[in-house]
């Protein structure tokens, strides 16, 4: 059974990653570019917006690339991430729904180095209209990680939501 979303159409693909999650991953990867952002929700000092047309432009970056793609059409973002990882010689980390039954996941397995499943809870994304975390995500989340200088290992790893939250919230408290 498919769960229908009550999110207005204009907000469906504009949800922001919670800061605690981004901060925890930023410690590990050192993000320089947010390749799917708006001027309101960019998480890096450098970002691409819808106007920049990220699917048809280069993701020039001097550090790792963060990508939380529109969930309505993930496949082209998977293809672009694989391409830009090699072209930019930078790690690309993509946050996606944990759904291994879809075609874009099979496509990702052709080139991804790591699939990191976030366990023990679902991510509450930031609603575009309110700026607040909203509960009720219908799926878990996982990270697809492309690394430029190794042959893809297609490894599956896990990390708990609680561990990421503790690290990420610690960053905010220390700042």
Task: Mark where each language-model region is.
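Class I S-adenosyl-L-methionine-dependent methyltransferase catalytic core
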Residues: 1-175
